[in-house]
Amino acid sequence: TNGAGSNSDTIGFAMQPPLVDGVRRDCLGNPVGTAADDDKVIINHFGIVVDPVSNEASLGCHAWNVTDGNWNPGSGIALTPLIEGIDSLQVLYGIDDSGGTSRSPTRYVDADSVSDWSDVLAIRIAVLANSVNRVTPTPVDRNYVLLDSDPLASADLLGPDGNPDSRARQIYSTTIHLKNTD
């Protein structure tokens, strides 16, 4: 989904979980069926989850078992924190709308602007990560712009006490070209 303004996006990946040590697992490490269940398909869904008490942001996930039509055991409707110190997640989708056969993206758009998901050839993902612990000296206030999002001001990233949290931050991004597109 596309988060408006500087709100985070969410993204899901449908897949047959790989067999690791005789067990298929979801994004939280929970088993998905048995090794003999070659037909299981899940959607690992990722987004930002904020702890209501500490106000700490994390990358979270949960898994929908498409084959069984329910949340995978150990997962649930709420995102479960997976990686602490992730303040924001933004996603863009590379499409080729030139009508050619290059199979290379001609532009990147947000989820709301994808008219045909079979046209998506690549995914561009960016996260804003923080140092988890406060640093000294306090970092200079600045704006962070992740892909197409509105600027996210460091002064707006508050700690549990309601004050700016004095953490170092860095934007990381990558582009993933999808191999299973035709």
Regions found by a protein language model. Give the residues of each.
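Low-complexity, S/T/G/P-rich flexible repeat/linker segments used as non-globular hinges
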Residues: 163-182
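N-terminal pilin/flagellin-like segments and related low-complexity appendage regions
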Residues: 1-126, 132-168
